[in-house]
């Protein structure tokens, strides 16, 4: 590239479109489906695949030992995600095909249904419209590694495998209290979920196979088979402790099911940090820039650099800087655009802080084509902000910063010569806080995917939170809960 020419500016629209529409992932999933299903007409198959628009529907296996809560979790997930609930029994009972009749004949003879036949049955059921459009939650299957491998050979692979886990003694106690409603097959428990309706209570019966000895045998079989199943799905499985309140278990299950696997798509971080003064935005931005090589763009710093470099825009904004006045938004945006559209920012990504401070500035940034793909709000109470800033002093001799509580001066001599930045006086800090709070709620509405992080903790703990959300895809949005009629 000719270094004597004007600096290369890359318009962000192309990469932004590809990322927003998930172009890379769409193509990757289509190629995967074509290779697995091997249709006779790949072009028409891909057109149909795009028409289905079902890449993000849930495809989940829920496994676990007896009485671990598989049925409860599957029902809650299906209700929350509007997915189809499947079990081996429901697949057999609702199917009238020749395959189902063949499988039922094995059961009538007291024989095990062959794994290959199970795979064909599942493939047939999952190809129906409700599973394609809404997704599916398969409970209690596969039970062995052989069944899991047969499912893989049939092209059935879950996006998430939930494995519920609890101590055997807890599971045995749970199982012995299980009761079944003969009217509708609903499961209740003598301790944890006893119905209040006397009619339902009269319908409850003790199911077969829940004695301590029988449960122990089923647990032995489960523990023998589950390691092989986990080896079959090493990257999509997660164990969740089921020995806790069921809503806590469900919260963890739902969080996992909504998570997305790490994408192989090219990812250029465009990170926006905002928060009250003293929340640590500058420190977090510098840590991100240092570790990942992205461009650290501090609004206040680039304005001062423009003045110091005596650029044309720098000369225009110099009076505002010298008089401690707010620089007009259009001038700020012009200077930021030079940095945000640079070759380095376009190829390595950027982290921006200090702008925008309100929705008008956020709209200007969006109209200019600079849309962050991660937005973090560093939350801090006013008392902590005032404590952090108003007690911070600087040694004019060494330039070292000290804090009356967290980092006191090493000697009385140093303490006596410490000076406070005028901007850190309690009165001015409170004024900046008032300005921040006046706009914070509207900024949260402007960026609906904003991730709130508690900044009142160790800065490296805060960085770990930011890092985890930056390197991994954002979770799927949670569907709206169905409204009762």
UniProtKB/Swiss-Prot annotation:
Catalytic activity: AMP + ATP = 2 ADP; a 2'-deoxyribonucleoside 5'-diphosphate + ATP = a 2'-deoxyribonucleoside 5'-triphosphate + ADP; a ribonucleoside 5'-diphosphate + ATP = a ribonucleoside 5'-triphosphate + ADP
GO molecular function term, any single one: ATP binding
Protein name: Adenylate kinase 8
Annotated segments matching region LID 1: 177-206
Stated family: Belongs to the adenylate kinase family.
Organism: Xenopus tropicalis
UniProt EC number: 2.7.4.3, 2.7.4.6
UniProt-annotated location(s): Cytoplasm, Cytosol
Annotated CDD domains: ADK, DD_AK8
Alphabetical keyword list: ATP-binding, Cytoplasm, Kinase, Nucleotide-binding, Transferase
Protein's job: Nucleoside monophosphate (NMP) kinase that catalyzes the reversible transfer of the terminal phosphate group between nucleoside triphosphates and monophosphates. Has highest activity toward AMP, and weaker activity toward dAMP, CMP and dCMP. Also displays broad nucleoside diphosphate kinase activity.
GO cellular component, one term: cytosol
Uppermost EC category: transferase
Annotated positions binding AMP 1: 140-143, 147, 218
Ranges where the record places region Adenylate kinase 2: 269-472
């Amino acid at each position: 590239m000719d270094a004597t020419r004007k600096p290369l500016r890359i318009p962000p629209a192309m990469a932004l479109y590809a990322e927003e529409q998930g172009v890379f992932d769409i193509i990757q999933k289509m190629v995967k489906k074509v290779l697995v299903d091997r249709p006779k007409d790949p072009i028409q198959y891909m057109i149909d695949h795009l028409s289905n628009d079902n890449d993000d529907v849930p495809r989940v296996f829920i496994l676990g030992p007896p009485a671990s809560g598989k049925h409860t979790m599957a029902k809650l997930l299906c209700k929350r995600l509007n997915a189809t609930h499947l079990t081996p029994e429901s697949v057999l009972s609702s199917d009238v095909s020749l395959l189902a009749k063949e499988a039922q004949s094995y059961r009538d003879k007291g024989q095990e249904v062959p794994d290959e036949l199970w795979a064909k049955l599942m493939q047939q059921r999952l190809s129906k419209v409700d599973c394609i459009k809404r997704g599916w939650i398969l409970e209690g299957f596969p039970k062995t590694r052989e069944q899991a491998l047969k499912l893989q050979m049939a092209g059935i692979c879950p996006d998430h495998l939930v494995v519920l886990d609890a101590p055997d003694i807890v599971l045995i106690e749970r199982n012995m209290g299980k009761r079944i409603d003969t009217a509708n097959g609903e499961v209740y428990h003598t301790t944890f979920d006893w119905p209040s309706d006397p009619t339902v209570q009269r319908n409850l019966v003790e199911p077969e196979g829940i004695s301590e000895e029988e449960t122990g045998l089923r647990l032995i079989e489960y523990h023998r088979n589950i390691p092989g199943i986990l080896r079959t799905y090493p990257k999509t499985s997660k164990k969740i402790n089921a020995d806790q309140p069921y809503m806590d278990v469900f919260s963890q299950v739902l969080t996992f099911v909504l998570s997305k696997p790490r994408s192989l798509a090219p990812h250029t971080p465009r990170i926006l940090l905002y928060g009250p003064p003293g929340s640590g935005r500058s420190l977090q931005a510098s840590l991100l820039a240092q570790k990942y090589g992205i461009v650290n763009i501090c609004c206040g710093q680039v304005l001062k650099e423009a003045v110091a470099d005596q650029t044309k825009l720098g000369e225009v904004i110099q009076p505002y800087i010298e008089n401690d006045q707010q620089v007009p938004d259009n001038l700020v945006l012009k200077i930021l655009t030079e940095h945000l559209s640079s070759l380095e920012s376009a190829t390595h990504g950027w982290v921006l802080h200090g702008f925008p401070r309100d929705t008008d500035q956020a709209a200007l940034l969006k109209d200019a084509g600079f849309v962050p793909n991660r937005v973090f709000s560093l939350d801090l109470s006013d008392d902590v902000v005032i404590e952090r800033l108003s007690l911070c002093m600087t040694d004019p001799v060494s330039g070292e910063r000290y804090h009356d509580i967290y980092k006191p001066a090493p000697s009385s001599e140093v303490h006596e010569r410490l000076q406070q930045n005028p901007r850190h006086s309690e009165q001015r800090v409170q004024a900046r806080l008032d300005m921040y709070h006046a706009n914070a709620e509207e900024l949260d509405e402007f960026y609906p995917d904003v991730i709130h992080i508690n900044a009142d903790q160790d800065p490296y703990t805060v960085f770990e939170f930011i890092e985890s959300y930056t390197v991994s895809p954002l979770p799927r949005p949670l569907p709206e809960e169905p409204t009762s009629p």
